[in-house]
C-alpha cells in the first residue's frame, strides 16, 4: 500500500489504451487499485496536488499457470523497447530496439493484438507476455 500523487496513481492503475511503462511494470508484479483519494486539504502545509492510496495485490509466480510465465529480464527488455518512442507504432519500436525483422514483428503483433499498427500503450500485460512467448529465445540475442 502506497500513497502517491493522484495522477501517478491513475497511471499505475491504467488500462489500455492508456498504459505506460510504469503501469506495465507495476501490473506485471501485481494488481493495483486505488482504494482512497486524499484531497490536498488533508495535509498541512497544503500541497498543490491531490493524492491517492494505491493497494497492490501481488501476483506470485507459483499461482500462475506455466504457460503464462515469462522471464522477467526479457519481459522488461521487450517492454522498454516498445515504449522507447511513445508516438511510434509498436512494430517500429520493437524491430529497431531489439534488432528484429519488421515483418516478423508485425506478424506477431497481428497474432497477439489483432492489429499490426498497435501502439505500446494499447497492449495489456498479458499481451506483452504473449509477444515475448511468440518470439521465445529470439529476443535474447
Regions found by a protein language model. Give the residues of each.
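Class I S-adenosyl-L-methionine
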Residues: 1-120, 130-141
Amino acid at each position: 500500500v502506497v500513497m502517491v500523487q493522484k495522477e501517478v496513481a491513475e497511471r499505475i492503475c491504467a488500462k489500455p489504451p492508456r498504459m505506460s511503462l510504469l503501469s506495465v511494470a507495476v501490473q506485471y508484479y501485481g494488481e493495483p487499485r486505488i482504494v482512497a483519494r486524499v484531497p490536498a486539504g488533508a495535509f498541512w502545509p497544503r500541497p498543490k496536488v491531490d493524492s491517492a492510496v494505491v493497494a497492490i495485490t501481488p501476483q506470485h509466480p507459483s499461482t500462475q499457470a506455466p504457460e503464462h510465465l515469462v522471464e522477467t529480464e526479457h519481459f522488461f527488455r521487450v517492454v522498454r523497447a516498445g515504449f522507447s518512442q511513445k508516438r511510434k507504432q509498436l512494430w517500429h519500436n520493437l524491430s529497431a530496439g531489439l534488432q528484429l525483422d519488421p515483418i516478423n514483428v508485425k506478424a506477431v503483433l497481428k497474432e497477439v493484438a489483432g492489429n499490426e499498427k498497435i501502439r505500446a500503450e494499447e497492449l495489456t500485460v498479458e499481451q506483452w507476455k504473449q509477444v515475448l512467448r511468440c518470439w521465445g529465445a529470439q529476443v535474447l540475442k
